[in-house]
Each structure stands twice: as structure tokens, then as C-alpha cells.
Curated annotation (Swiss-Prot):
GO molecular function: 2 iron, 2 sulfur cluster binding; 4 iron, 4 sulfur cluster binding; biotin synthase activity; metal ion binding
Family annotation (SMART domains): Elp3 (SM00729)
Binding site for [4Fe-4S] cluster: 44, 50, 53
Top-rank taxon, per record: Archaea
Organism of provenance: Methanocaldococcus jannaschii (strain ATCC 43067 / DSM 2661 / JAL-1 / JCM 10045 / NBRC 100440)
Stored Gene3D superfamilies: Aldolase class I
Residues covered by the Radical SAM core domain: 27-242
Alphabetical UniProt keywords: 4Fe-4S, Iron, Iron-sulfur, Metal-binding, S-adenosyl-L-methionine
BP-aspect Gene Ontology terms: biotin biosynthetic process
Protein name: Uncharacterized protein MJ0597
Cofactor: [4Fe-4S] cluster
First and last residue of the signal peptide: none
């Protein structure tokens, strides 16, 4: 492509971003929020894990998969802290290898401590054995729509993911997918994604920029550029004005945040919470969001809110009546002391990090 045509393409993307930003304001108002996936563990039981994934590099190092699971009090403590600082749970994830009952119990308890329904991203799940009263939606890990998808994600057949999402829709749940940019996708793949969104009637989509992991084939590969990322986000917004768009970037890509919001993103995700909260990077992230003219719900910098010394004034959380089994209520209450200890441990970790920085 000539320099002139490249310039025309960039100008087109920037113009589309401008239109997408206006559409986002029209349908979602002037706010941006933080979200974060709640991971249950570090082991993936897929026989053929994804080529890009950190868990794939750890699989052979983990002799006992159950020891790679997080303790329940740790999961619930993080859920409580996320509500405290106004970060919605993007979804409960990392559940490959869990039984439907285990997923159900965890979802019930997380919903109970947060007083709101949850999204699941735990692979193809048997929804008939899940308490749907605590589930807002189901997310499918599509990851990429490129021609190499079956090779990149051999353990995640697209047809099964689609069937699971369509069943969730029939049951009255919201649905979404995850897409990772930087896996070799082409611009023409955007049309494939738009067709998939329409086919599945999705309520939301999460984009991530590839964070190349050591030990994977992508270790030395470049990730997606800001302009490319903007093109994907604005294309989805212009074609689906009411879809929720979540965009994830790593700490080394903070300058991407403003352009992504200006391209139609509602939500920023992916940042490591406890190692970054209150640091200069966290202040920079908030500044990037506010620079777009958007209002930020939630905080990445207020230590007093994290520590529970004051209450967040503006939160994206809307409390709901949550009904779970008496058995799981009992489990939560029996763990209260341990949960509170984990909360204090997380807060102390943040304070030490800030003091050392």
C-alpha cells in the first residue's frame, strides 16, 4: 500500500472513531468504568491449550492441578474489594477443570458477597446445572476469528461455543465473547467478527491486546497497534451502537486507553489490581480516561476507599436480591474471618507497593 493510501486509511479510522465516540455517548452516557476478570486458578485442563496462553506454559509444571486453584476465601475477598472500589467483575474465569457444581457454588457465593449477578467465562458449561438466578450472562472465549483459529485454539471448538451462547440466550441470559488482537488477524477479519456478533445477537464483547508470554510462539511477536485496535473497536460500535465494548490493555500500553475510549469503548480492563493500585501507573491510567472528557466510575488510586475507611460515592454496582442455597450461605459465613484476613492482606500488599515506589 502506498503512503497516500495509508494516510487515507488512517484518516478513515479516525473519522470512524469520532462517529463511534458520539454513538457511545448517545447510548451509554458519559461514563467509563473499570472491570476485571475474577480468576479461579492457574491450571487449564484442555488437552490442547491455546498457543498464546500463559497457562499453557505452566501446564507441565503443575503436578497436582487442585493445588493450582485459589482458595475460596481469596476469591471472595477479591470480589468484595472489587465492589468496594467500584470495579465490576468482568466475569468469573479460569474454571477449566471445575465441575458444574463447583462453578455453580462459586458463582452463588460471589454473587452473594457482591449482591449482584455474575457473568461466567468457564468454557462450554452445562447451564441446566447452574442457578441462573445468580447469572447475568455467559461469555464465550472465541479469542480470534482469523483463518488460523482452529490451530491457535484447538481446544475451543467454535461450534460448541456458539451453541452454548445460543442456549444461554434462549434461557434469557446476556451473552458476550472475548477477542484477542495480535494473533495474526487481518483487517478483512473484522467483517467475520461483525457477522458473528449479528449471528449470536451478542450483548457485549471484550477485546484484549495480546500480551506476548514467554515460552509461547508469540513471545517475540509484536502486538496490535493503536490504530489497528481503534479500527476494530470503532467498527463494532458503528455497526452495533448498543453493544457493550470492553477493552483490555496491559500496563505497558497505557497510552492506548484514550484512543480506545474515543473509538467507542465503555470499559477498561486487564490491569493487575493489587500490584498497580495507587501507583503512578494507576494515576496515569485514570488521567488517560479523564482526558477523553468521560467521567470515571470507580477508583484505581483512592487508598482510603480500598481500605474501607470511606465509601465510594459513584459506583457502577446496582445491588440485587440474590438467592442462593443455605449450604453456600453457611460456607460464606464460616469463612468470614478468613475472608477478612485476606482482605487485610491484599490492602497491606498495596500499601507496601506504594511505599516502595
Amino acid at each position: 500500500m502506498t503512503i497516500g493510501r495509508e494516510k487515507m486509511k488512517v484518516e478513515e479510522i479516525l473519522e470512524n472513531a469520532r462517529k463511534a465516540f458520539k454513538l457511545t455517548t448517545k447510548h451509554f452516557g458519559n461514563t467509563v468504568t473499570f472491570e476485571r476478570a475474577l480468576f479461579l486458578g492457574w491450571y487449564c485442563n484442555l488437552k490442547q491449550p491455546c498457543k498464546f496462553c500463559y497457562m499453557a506454559t505452566q501446564k507441565n509444571k503443575i503436578k497436582d492441578p487442585r493445588k493450582a486453584r485459589r482458595r475460596l476465601e481469596s476469591v471472595l475477598a477479591e470480589a468484595i474489594l472489587m465492589k468496594r472500589i467500584g470495579w465490576k467483575l468482568e466475569f468469573i474465569s479460569g474454571g477449566y477443570g471445575y465441575t458444574p457444581k463447583e462453578i455453580n457454588d462459586i458463582a452463588e457465593m460471589v454473587a452473594y458477597v457482591q449482591k449482584c449477578r455474575q457473568y461466567l467465562n468457564v468454557g462450554v458449561i452445562d447451564l441446566d446445572n447452574i442457578n441462573l438466578d445468580v447469572i447475568e450472562g455467559v461469555v464465550g472465549a472465541v479469542e480470534t476469528v482469523s483463518k488460523d483459529r482452529d490451530w491457535i485454539c484447538p481446544g475451543k471448538p467454535l461450534d460448541k461455543i456458539k451453541d452454548n451462547l445460543l442456549k444461554a440466550k434462549e434461557l434469557g441470559l446476556k451473552t458476550g465473547i472475548t477477542i484477542i488482537l495480535g494473533l495474526g488477524e487481518k483487517e478483512e477479519d473484522i467483517e467475520k467478527l461483525l457477522n458473528l456478533i449479528e449471528e449470536l445477537d451478542l450483548n457485549r464483547i471484550t477485546f484484549y491486546s495480546l500480551n506476548p508470554q514467554k515460552g509461547t510462539i508469540y513471545e517475540n511477536k509484536p502486538s496490535v497497534t493503536t490504530i489497528e485496535y481503534m479500527n476494530w473497536v470503532s467498527s463494532v460500535r458503528l455497526n452495533f451502537p448498543k453493544i457493550k465494548i470492553i477493552t483490555g490493555v496491559w500496563v505497558d500500553k497505557i497510552p492506548m486507553i484514550s484512543p480506545l475510549i474515543m473509538s467507542g469503548s465503555n470499559v477498561i480492563t486487564k490491569f493487575p489490581l493489587f500490584s498497580v493500585f495507587g501507583t503512578k501507573e494507576a494515576h496515569w491510567i485514570e488521567k488517560e480516561i479523564l482526558a477523553t472528557g468521560r467521567e470515571l466510575l470507580g477508583t484505581f488510586t483512592d487508598i482510603d476507599i480500598l481500605a474501607g475507611k470511606k465509601v465510594l460515592e459513584k459506583t457502577p454496582y446496582i445491588e440485587e436480591e440474590i438467592n442462593i442455597s443455605s449450604e453456600n450461605i453457611k460456607r460464606v459465613e464460616e469463612l468470614r474471618e478468613n475472608i477478612n484476613e485476606r482482605i487485610e492482606s491484599y490492602v497491606s500488599k498495596v500499601l507496601r507497593k506504594i511505599k516502595a515506589s
